[in-house]
Amino acid sequence: MKKTYRVKCEKDFQAIFKDGKSTANRKFVIYHLNRGQDHFRVGISVGKKIGNAVTRNAVKRKIRHVIMALGYQLKSEDFVVIARKGVESLEYQELQQNLHHVLKLAQLLEKGFESEEKH
């Protein structure tokens, strides 16, 4: 993922948490904030409750892959994806469906793409 598509610094994370809206399902929480940029930016947070570093990094890679696959469908907002406990045991397909579901709930998918549940 290119640097321009990442939320990295602490003040950006805090601004999204403070001023943004949140949406959640059983496996993910998403905070999002529209800042008027021309493309989306994403931050991924996987806490220590999920597992050791190897497990957390594997979960982050899967999330990153799903986000980049949906890239052209996502609205131009900053958002933070927080993984909840239990996400580490999901297969890729289940993780993809859960993440797609919470993005749809947060209305972060462009119009016309919401009906594409199954890939």
Swiss-Prot record:
It comes from the Bacteria. Keywords: Endonuclease, Hydrolase, Nuclease, RNA-binding, tRNA processing. InterPro entries: Ribosomal_Su5_D2-typ_SF, Ribsml_uS5_D2-typ_fold_subgr, RNase_P, RNase_P_CS. GO terms for cellular component: ribonuclease P complex. GO terms for biological process: tRNA 5'-leader removal. Its EC number is 3.1.26.5. Consists of a catalytic RNA component (M1 or rnpB) and a protein subunit. Belongs to the RnpA family. RNaseP catalyzes the removal of the 5'-leader sequence from pre-tRNA to produce the mature 5'-terminus. It can also cleave other RNA substrates such as 4.5S RNA. The protein component plays an auxiliary but essential role in vivo by binding to the 5'-leader sequence and broadening the substrate specificity of the ribozyme. This is Ribonuclease P protein component. It comes from Streptococcus pyogenes serotype M12 (strain MGAS2096). The gene is rnpA.
